[in-house]
């Protein structure tokens, strides 16, 4: 029996990127090998302005798991989210939510 201490499992390292999409400040957190080798966990948060609607989340936070190769192919976590946001920004639901938010802003 060895007296050497047991090796603690290394925690996945997080990388945070800040980016802007259509005037909205956001962050993208990328954790590699989250579920196992080759699987990434991405998190997106709306930083400013708080409460502004974005097309892929109603809460300002999004958690997404995907293959690491998909993150690389997109050009990184911020590029992955910006492409997703651009695709979904054309939806009727998003345009309606944005119009409602802008109308409320007039009365602030």
Where are each of the predicted segments found?
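Generic preference for well-ordered secondary structure
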Residues: 3-12, 65, 69
């Amino acid at each position: 029996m060895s007296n050497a201490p047991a090796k603690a499992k290394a925690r996945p390292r997080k990388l945070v990127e800040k980016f802007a999409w259509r005037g909205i400040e956001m962050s993208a957190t990328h954790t590699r090998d989250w579920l196992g080798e080759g699987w990434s966990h991405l998190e997106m948060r709306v930083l400013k302005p708080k409460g502004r609607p974005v097309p892929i989340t109603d809460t300002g936070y999004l958690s997404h798991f995907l293959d690491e190769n998909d993150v690389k192919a997109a050009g990184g976590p911020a590029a992955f989210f910006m492409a997703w946001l651009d695709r979904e920004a054309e939806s009727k639901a998003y345009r309606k939510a944005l119009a409602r938010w802008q109308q409320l802003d007039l009365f602030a």
